[in-house]
């Protein structure tokens, strides 16, 4: 379905993503793991077609990322991108005008489940409410691949539960999902595979059961990115491993 081949993205001389090759299969839910600055957001934006790779190739269903793939990939960014004077309803109309696959009826139903008033202004929303609006907009598309960049960041426990419920609801429809998150415990049981980024490089990828063994994704995260992982990387660079 989605295939990245030797993909690199540089900002000036510094690579944000370096020589990443991977393939995502249809119908699976992937956790995209890594600390801040590891290249997760850059990778997602390239897949969404918002920025271009410096080198390498990204294909979706055999087609290069571009206008032809826009309707197949939905992306929820970390930042709000609406004008403060807009209402939640206006945001839906904006999406409807921009994306042919946007379902306004589904949008209203999702807003109702998450207790959001379509008449409320964007400027009056808390960070958690804003995140729920962005989630509702993303889930109201009929894309094959849904990407969520830190959907649980900056939201309270109750809002997290609502966000997770909506993602799971959409997952049951057989869509493929790529979820960037630090809060892996919240989604652990729904993750099929994990992609681990470190300093812009693909550090590890595989089915969750194979990667974690008897442990959890949190254990895997600490192993790769915690003190032990940093020491192992330093030893390897020094030729001690």
Report residues per predicted region:
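ABC-family P-loop ATPase nucleotide-binding domains
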Residues: 78-133
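Catalytic Walker B motif of ABC-type/P-loop ATPase nucleotide-binding domains
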Residues: 146-150, 155
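Helix-to-loop junction immediately C-terminal to a conserved catalytic motif
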Residues: 48
């Amino acid at each position: 379905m989605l295939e990245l081949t030797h993909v690199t993205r540089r900002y000036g001389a510094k690579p944000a993503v370096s020589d990443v090759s991977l393939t995502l299969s249809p119908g699976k839910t992937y956790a995209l793991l890594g600390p801040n600055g590891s290249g997760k957001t850059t990778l997602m934006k390239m897949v969404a077609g918002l920025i271009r790779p410096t080198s390498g190739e990204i294909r979706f269903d055999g087609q290069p990322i571009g206008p032809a793939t826009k309707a197949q990939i939905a992306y929820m960014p970390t930042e709000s991108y609406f004008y403060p004077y807009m209402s939640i309803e206006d945001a839906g109309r904006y999406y409807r005008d921009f994306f042919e696959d946007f379902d306004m009826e589904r949008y209203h139903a999702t807003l109702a489940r998450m207790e959001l008033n379509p008449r409320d202004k964007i400027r009056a929303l808390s960070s958690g409410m804003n995140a729920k609006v962005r989630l509702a907009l993303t889930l109201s598309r009929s894309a094959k691949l849904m990407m969520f960049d830190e959907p649980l960041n900056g939201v309270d426990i109750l809002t997290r539960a609502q966000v997770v419920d909506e993602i799971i609801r959409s997952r049951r429809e057989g869509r493929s999902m790529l979820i960037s998150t630090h809060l892996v415990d919240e989604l652990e049981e729904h993750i099929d595979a994990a992609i681990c980024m470190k300093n812009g490089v693909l550090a590890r990828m595989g089915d969750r059961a194979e990667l974690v063994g008897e442990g959890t994704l949190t254990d895997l995260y600490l192993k790769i990115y915690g003190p032990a992982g940093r020491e192992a990387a330093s030893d390897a660079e020094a030729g001690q491993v």
